[in-house]
C-alpha cells in the first residue's frame, strides 16, 4: 500500500515540475471605464489607495491585476475574492462590486496598473491600463458614495467567516490524531493539578487553550507578512509546481513514510522549559499552552505547515492570525470538555485515529492537484484526480478489514470512490475536460461535433489591421459575406462558443459560403486596440456580419455569448434581410 501512495505522490511531483440568450434581453454592455470605475488617491499616511467600483453583473480577475513599474516587494496584498468557476479555465478568484488595495508609503514615481474583467452576460474586456502617480496626484476620480463598509470589505468578511469555521473544524480533527487524544488525560493533570473544582479546571484549561491559540495566531500573522507579495509570483508554473511538491511532501508523513517534526535540539529545549512549569495556576497554564503551541508533535507538523503555506499565499495578516487562532481553539475544545465534564463525551483511542491521519494525507494530495490545475492540460489533470480517487478507494477497502460492524461504510465508500475514479480515468483517456461529466466526451452529440475539424480550419486568424483590410477587399471583390469573430485566449465565453457553436457540424455547414475571419485580440498591443477600435467593439466575443457590399449589418451584431440555435437564427435573419 505504501508503494502505491509513494508512486502517486512522485507522479504528482513529477508533473508539477514538468444558458442565457442575450438576444432576447438585448444586453447593453457598459464601456470598460464605466464597468470598472478606477480611482487612485494619496492618503495622509503616505500610502496610495487604489479602488475599483465594479458595476453589477461584472467582475475583475484577480490574476489579471498588474503593477508595472512597481518592485515586487511593494506590490499590494491581494484580498481573497469570490471563486468563479468555468468549464475552460477552472476556478478563478474574481472581485465583484468593489476592490480596494493600498500601496505602502515610500513608493514613488509613476506606475501602470493593469486589470481585466468580464460581464456575466458573456463579454470579456481586453486588458486595460491606468497610469498612477505615486507622488500624490489624483488622476482618476469617481463618486464613491459609500456610508458603510465597501463591497470588497463585505466580501472579505463573508470569506473570513467561512475560513474561521473550516479552520476550527480542522483543529477539532487534529485533536483526535494519535499524537493528541491519548495525551489529553495526562495534559489535563499537568494543567489543573489535583483537587481543582470543575469551574477552576475550566478556567485553567481556558488559559492553556487561549495561550496556545495565540501562539498559532502569531504564526499565522508572520506567515501572511512573509508571503504578502507571493500572489504576484503564483502565476509562475514552476512556483506552483514547487508548492504542489511541498504539499505532496507533507502528505507522506500522514501515510507513515516518515515523521516530520521539530529538530531534536529545539524540541528538547522546549520540553525542559515545559517540565519546569507548574500547573494549578492561570499563569502556569498559560505558559504551558504557549509552549505547546511551539512544541509541535509529529502528527501536527504537516497539517500546521500546510495551513501556514495556505496563509502565506493569502498575504492577509489579520486573516491569517484569526483563522489559526480558530484552529487553536478547535484543538483545545476536547481538553475543555475533559476538565469540566470528564471523558464520557470523548471518543476512545483506537485504530480510527490512524484513519484520520490518512484523511489528512489525501487532503494534502488533493490540494497539490488543485494547485496544479492552472498549468496542466485539463484531461491530464482529470486523469490524476481519477488516480487519486482509485487509491483512496483501495485504501478504504483495506481499512474496512479492521472496523467490524462499520465495515460496510468503508465498503460503500470504496465502491463509490472506485467507480468515480474509474470514470474519470476513462474520460481522461478520451480527452475529457469535465470533472463532473467525464464520459460526455464519448456521447453521440459530442462525437459528431468533435469529428468536424472545420471549426478551426475554416477560420482565418487575423492579428494585423492591414491583413484584415486585405481580406475584406478580397471578399467584396468576390461578392462574399464575411463573419468577423473577435476572439482572445483569455476570453472564457470565446472558448464556450468555439466548442458549442462553431464546433457544431450544422453551424459550419450553414456558413459554408461565408468568409470566416477570426480577429485575435489576445495581446494587449496597438494592433489589438486598432482591431477593436475599427468597429468600436468593447471586447470578445463579438460577431459582426459584413455584407457582400463591404458594409457591416450593425443591427445584427452579436455581442457576448450565445448558443448555436440563437446564432443560426441571427444569421438567417441577416441573410434573408439583404
Curated annotation (Swiss-Prot):
Residues 180-207, 259-281, 343-351, 395-408 are cytoplasmic. It catalyses: [protein]-dithiol + NAD(+) = [protein]-disulfide + NADH + H(+); [protein]-dithiol + NADP(+) = [protein]-disulfide + NADPH + H(+). The keyword Transferase does not apply. SUPFAM superfamilies: Thiol:disulfide interchange protein DsbD, N-terminal domain (DsbD-alpha) (SSF74863), Thioredoxin-like (SSF52833). One of its GO terms (biological process) is cytochrome complex assembly. Belongs to the thioredoxin family. DsbD subfamily. This is Thiol:disulfide interchange protein DsbD. The lineage of its organism: Bacteria, Pseudomonadati, Pseudomonadota, Gammaproteobacteria, Pseudomonadales.
